[in-house]
């Protein structure tokens, strides 16, 4: 059984049988953590809607951080980061693979914005958190910029082609209007995503309905998020 809690914006807590995964928590109440189960904390990049210093107060086995979150001596002093905590931090760029725990593999993809996306394999499941890796197509932006964004997005996500992903947390950003459908639609066509949790919606949870009205074929795999603090449980046959 896999459990997930939507903390807010792009923050999720995912519970697998043998490990707990915390992604991009910066807002919302963190549920009680399971005692005796190792915690891995992920921060995809430094933007304030994806990262906050309070994560370092958690009793985590490891902190996996996008490389743009600089653990320089100056930052460590400013953040009052102990040597013990700093030793558990892994700074990751795109296209890296690490094993922070026995039986757990973390792969990264470059982002089209800042930092990285995370692909975690553990307990026979694969969980993907995109961070800000998205097809950012902005109406009114320079056409060349938008074309370059499309090229980079498709190149960065190519390693996911045909790959089974049991649970994917993907940006579905209403600020882009219908252009916000581009990213998740491409992800869902590219990879074998079993369950998709929308994120980065800025509280506009009804935007998922608009996405599904445009792409009804994705309804069976899309799990709408409707409120902060919402819990989800996925049985083995569902993910």
Task: Give names to the regions the model predicted.
Residues 5-10, 84-98, 181-239:
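Binuclear metal-ion centers of metallo-dependent hydrolases, dominated by the metallo-beta-lactamase
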Residues 27-74, 158-169:
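Active-site metal-binding motif and surrounding structural segment of the metallo-beta-lactamase
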Residues 64-96:
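Glycine/small-residue-rich loop that forms an oxyanion/phosphate-binding "nest" at active or ligand-binding sites
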Residues 52-60, 75-78, 206-215:
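Metal-dependent catalytic neighborhoods of phosphoester/phosphodiester hydrolases
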Residues 28-30, 46-51, 70-74, 96-99, ...:
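Active-site environment of divalent metal-dependent phosphoester hydrolases
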């Amino acid at each position: 059984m896999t459990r997930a809690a939507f903390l807010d914006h792009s923050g999720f807590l995912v519970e697998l049988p043998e490990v707990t995964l915390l992604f991009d928590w910066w807002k919302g109440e963190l549920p009680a953590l399971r005692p005796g189960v190792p915690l891995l904390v992920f921060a995809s990049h430094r933007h304030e809607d994806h990262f906050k210093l309070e994560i370092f107060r958690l009793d985590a086995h490891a902190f996996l951080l996008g490389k743009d979150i600089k653990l320089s001596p100056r930052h460590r002093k400013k953040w009052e980061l102990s040597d013990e905590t700093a030793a558990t931090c892994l700074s990751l760029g795109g296209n890296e693979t690490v094993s922070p725990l026995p039986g757990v593999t973390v792969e990264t993809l470059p982002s089209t914005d800042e930092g990285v996306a995370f692909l975690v394999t553990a307990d026979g499941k694969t969980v993907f958190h995109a961070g800000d890796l998205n097809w950012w197509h902005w109406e009114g932006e320079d056409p060349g910029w938008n074309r370059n964004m499309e090229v980079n997005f498709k190149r960065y996500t190519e390693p996911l082609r045909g790959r089974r992903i049991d649970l994917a947390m993907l940006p579905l950003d209403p600020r882009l209007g219908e252009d916000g459908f581009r990213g998740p639609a491409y992800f869902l066509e590219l990879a074998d995503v079993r369950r998709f949790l929308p994120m980065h919606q800025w509280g506009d949870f009804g935007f998922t309905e608009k996405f599904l009205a445009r792409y009804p074929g994705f309804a069976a795999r899309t799990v709408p998020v409707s409120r902060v603090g919402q819990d989800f449980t996925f049985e083995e046959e569902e993910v």
